[in-house]
């Protein structure tokens, strides 16, 4: 017997939606949602396709996700072409199977089943879908959220379908995320000949004590909801490639994943104070890609935990670990935000796959969440 969740996932995988190209995925989802009475508003910005869809009125539960995927890498290393979905030994292979076309299919099928059983549901059910989450994310969810906030749209609860699970569906639910702050730092020196160091000023030598002190800082100890803030140097570049030239500049890029114990301004102030302490000549640029957010126990978290316990008979861990997601933008609307999706073991990898039975289970969990919050 065919399964509508698997069939829709396969249809989505066949559309090679390399970010920010949607490749027809949203048209497919919109057709399904309009057929069950959703009003759909396309909200495209530049090269990114987005849509906001809703049905009903009142307290609002939105499901959020992205149709775009990362490049598949060397297609010859896949057991099957990455955009030709294949099921082997119960596993559905294809780029986007886990991140996150399987979740999108589960959301839509759950909505179809929910509406069939509750055609006059009490609350409002909504979808916020973008084609740019994996790349810059500049014209995706963040722009939709800004537009919705400008007209005072209501959003009480949001479930993001990112692959949150580790071993089985629902073993981990993300009820928050750390903030992300990147520093692009250039240390200025004076270029010269290595045989005449007194005529130059080596920025690598000057920066070494600063960097040594920077990496030794314990920024905080975290708290009951967040791990300790982490700082990692991601890129470092200097020199001309020649062994007889002292470089004139050193570029260092480092990233903070920070908890609610800190603010981005506190981090910036400490870094700048350290630069001044070491008397460095520098230019600095900051990129704040997301503030930390946390959804405490409440109606949404309780509904998600209930759905997982009902269908998988496990109590999920509530964690805030991992990278950023579009949940950071949606949280600005004051909504409770939680992430629940399939196992993430193969996301962005060659031979990305998801257990087909897990997607069926996920659709049932999503439907039960709808029933608890907007039926």
Swiss-Prot record:
Family matches, as Gene3D superfamilies: Zn peptidases (3.40.630.10)
Key word Flavoprotein present: no
Single GO molecular function: zinc ion binding
Active-site residues (renumbered): 68, 133 (proton acceptor)
Classification via Pfam families: M20_dimer, Peptidase_M20
Lineage of the organism: Bacteria, Pseudomonadati, Pseudomonadota, Gammaproteobacteria, Enterobacterales
Oligomer status and interactors: Homodimer.
Family from the record: Belongs to the peptidase M20A family. DapE subfamily.
Organism: Escherichia coli O17:K52:H18 (strain UMN026 / ExPEC)
Cofactor field: Zn(2+); Co(2+)
Catalyzed chemical reaction(s): N-succinyl-(2S,6S)-2,6-diaminopimelate + H2O = (2S,6S)-2,6-diaminopimelate + succinate
Source organism, top-level taxon: Bacteria
Protein's name according to its UniProt entry: Succinyl-diaminopimelate desuccinylase
InterPro entries cross-referenced by the UniProt entry: ArgE/DapE_CS, Bact_exopeptidase_dim_dom, DapE_proteobac, Peptidase_M20, Peptidase_M20_dimer, Peptidase_M20A
């Amino acid at each position: 017997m065919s399964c509508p969740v698997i069939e829709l996932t396969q249809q989505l995988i066949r559309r090679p939606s390399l970010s920010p190209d949607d490749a027809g995925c949203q048209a497919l989802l919109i057709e399904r949602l309009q057929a069950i009475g959703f009003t759909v508003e396309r909200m495209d910005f530049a090269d990114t396709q987005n849509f906001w869809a809703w049905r009903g009125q009142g307290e609002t539960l939105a499901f959020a996700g992205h149709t775009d995927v990362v490049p598949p890498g060397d297609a010859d290393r896949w057991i099957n072409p990455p955009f030709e979905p294949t099921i082997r030994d119960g596993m559905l292979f294809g780029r986007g199977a886990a991140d996150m076309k399987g979740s999108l299919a589960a959301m839509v099928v759950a909505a179809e089943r929910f509406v069939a059983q509750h055609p006059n549901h009490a609350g409002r059910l909504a979808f916020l879908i973008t084609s740019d989450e994996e790349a810059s994310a500049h014209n995706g969810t963040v722009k939709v959220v800004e537009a919705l906030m400008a007209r005072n749209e209501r959003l009480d609860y949001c479930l993001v379908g990112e692959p949150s699970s580790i071993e089985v569906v629902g073993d981990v639910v993300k009820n928050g995320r750390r903030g992300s702050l990147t520093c692009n730092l250039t240390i200025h020196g004076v270029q010269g000949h290595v045989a005449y160091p007194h005529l130059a000023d080596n920025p690598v030598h000057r920066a070494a004590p600063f960097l040594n002190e920077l990496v030794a800082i314990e920024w905080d100890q975290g708290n009951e909801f967040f791990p300790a803030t982490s700082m990692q140097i991601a890129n470092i570049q200097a020199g001309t490639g020649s062994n007889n030239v002292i470089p004139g500049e050193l570029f260092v890029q480092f990233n903070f994943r920070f908890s609610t114990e800190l603010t981005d301004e506190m981090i910036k102030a400490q870094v700048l104070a350290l630069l001044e302490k070491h008397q460095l000549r520098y230019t600095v640029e900051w990129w704040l890609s997301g503030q930390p957010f946390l959804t405490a126990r409440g109606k949404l978290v309780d509904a998600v935990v209930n759905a997982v316990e009902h269908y998988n008979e496990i109590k999920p861990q509530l964690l805030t670990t991992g990278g950023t997601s579009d949940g950071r933008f949606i949280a600005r609307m004051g909504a409770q935000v939680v992430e629940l999706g399939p196992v993430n073991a193969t996301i962005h990898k060659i031979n990305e796959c998801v257990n087909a039975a897990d997607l069926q289970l996920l659709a049932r969990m999503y439907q039960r969440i709808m029933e608890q919050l907007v039926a």
